[in-house]
Amino acid sequence: HSAGGRNAWMYAVTHPGKVSSLMVVDIDPDADNPESRSMFERYHAEPDEWESLEAVIERLRGRQPASTDEMLRHQALHMTRELPGGRRVWKRDRALLEAYERPDLWEEWRRISCPTLIVRGRQSDLLRHDVAVRMREEIKRVRLVELDGGGHWFYQEQHGAFETTVRWFLQRPP
């Protein structure tokens, strides 16, 4: 999902014999994506520490309003660690977040040789429909699925549809 998808396809390109199929979830190969830049700007502006787990959950709810309380709690627990006194801190390296560069990966995208599934939430601003279609056209063994009812976090917002899509792809790769 997201930047992890970029990492996955780079691994698939550099180690083609080790990857039998690939899923890319709501991310594109573009170097400059205004929505991605906006998301990172919001992450930069966030505090490193939060008063409580509930405060983290509320922050996540603001980003992902369609996610269930259970999903948000799970995410908050695994994305933060508890400090003495009950405060929470993100499990992230701020220096990496600030140094993150988004290279153009279209050339690498075209080198993917394994069956690939592109999954996009129709309400996502991060992976636009026109870019997803171009991604589908650039490589041979690929399928594009666009799911209704969610944005960038649709695997949480519409987890049943996402799971069905994953199972379908794994059973019938292109």
Where do the protein language model's features map onto the residues?
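C-terminal alpha-helix
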Residues: 165-173
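Conserved alpha/beta-hydrolase catalytic His-Asp/Glu region
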Residues: 33, 49-108
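Conserved alpha/beta-hydrolase "nucleophile elbow" surrounding the catalytic nucleophile
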Residues: 1-2
